[in-house]
Amino acid sequence: QSFQTFSVTYMHSAKVQFLLNDLQGVHRLSSREENLARLRSSVREIQPGQKFEVKDFDPQDAEGIAALFYAVYGETIPVDSVYDPEHYIQANADRQMHHIVGRTASGDVVGLHAYFRNPPGKHIMELGSWIVLPSYRNTSLALRLVQHSLGNVPDYLGLHVVYTQNVCDHLISQKVTDRFKARSCAIELEAMPSRPDDAPDGAGGRISMIDAFLVRQDIPHAVRLPSVYAAVLEGMYASRGLQREFVEDDRPQGMSRSSVESMDAASLARMTVQAVGTDIAEHIGRFVLESPDRHIHQVVLPLWQPGVSVAVRAARSVGFFLGGLLPLWDDRDMLLMQKLRTEPDYSKVQL
């Protein structure tokens, strides 16, 4: 079947837009208009049926990666940096990203998989941007990209965990992830809009995502389990082979600290709590009130911090419910909670 069911679009790539901002101070990146003009003028057909190899990124691949995004998605991606070759060169050099490419003997880039720093921890990266040129989707390239990505994780990245998201409007990516021993730990209901090629009225429906984790090196530590979810979380830890010390929760102290990430294209807002304070209920309530138009709100809570039970009660009181466990998300475990504007369409979720 079409590789379109495999590919993860850059819908969530607003999460890595910070790279563009950081790198502009290092090297003058071209504007979106400059890059698109260059790509328009250099469009050509890549000969199908060429032999290819799967390799780690080389600076000579940068232009080909930008061209691949353009060939597959045109000018629809809202993240400017995906069209800029210099972005890939600098981000790989700075170890903020790590690309794996499918490269033909003539040097054309016909496939891509990439690590990028989305989770807050130092020892975890997200694996995504799984893309293959349409004329190469009937080959082994898609699977070979995954095999290389998960079987040859560079030591210099220092990763304890590889995190990936699998769509729930089909089972293919979930099965591939399971084959490589990544474990599903959370579900983000309706976290993405319907696919661009769905009916104009969005009849395909919003897409839920499974958060899966390949734990390469577990880091045992103490966690506080909110009583309402304790049985579920204890079962998840046991079934996924994660060693934790369960300690009694305590009252929160001080003031709450958090950061908010907003993804307009997905109508999603996420608050990650760095410190659970005595004002956590007001903190969560304000977060919801300040983005009332979002289809989905998410709150990510630190399971190692005193007061997480208070935070869970506060979130539940305004409509949040369990999304799941995020192992070593900030180099320690965090809890995902979510709130949807409307009742989810569970008939669209394939597991």
Show where each model-derived region lies:
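Conserved active-site tyrosine of GNAT-family acetyltransferases
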Residues: 1, 175-177, 315
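Conserved acetyl-CoA-binding loop-helix of GNAT-fold acetyltransferases
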Residues: 1, 132, 138-153, 162-164, ...
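Conserved catalytic-core motifs of GNAT/GCN5-like acyltransferases
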Residues: 3-18, 41, 163-165, 178-201, ...
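Conserved GNAT acetyl-CoA-binding A-motif
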Residues: 3-6, 153-167, 294-302
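C-terminal "cap" of GNAT-fold acetyltransferases
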Residues: 10-30, 192-226, 331-351
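Conserved N-terminal entry element of GNAT/NAT acetyltransferase domains
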Residues: 15-60
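A conserved beta-strand-loop-helix scaffold within acyl/acetyltransferase catalytic domains
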Residues: 49, 56-134, 260-265, 277, ...
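Non-catalytic interaction/regulatory modules that flank or connect domains
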Residues: 230-328
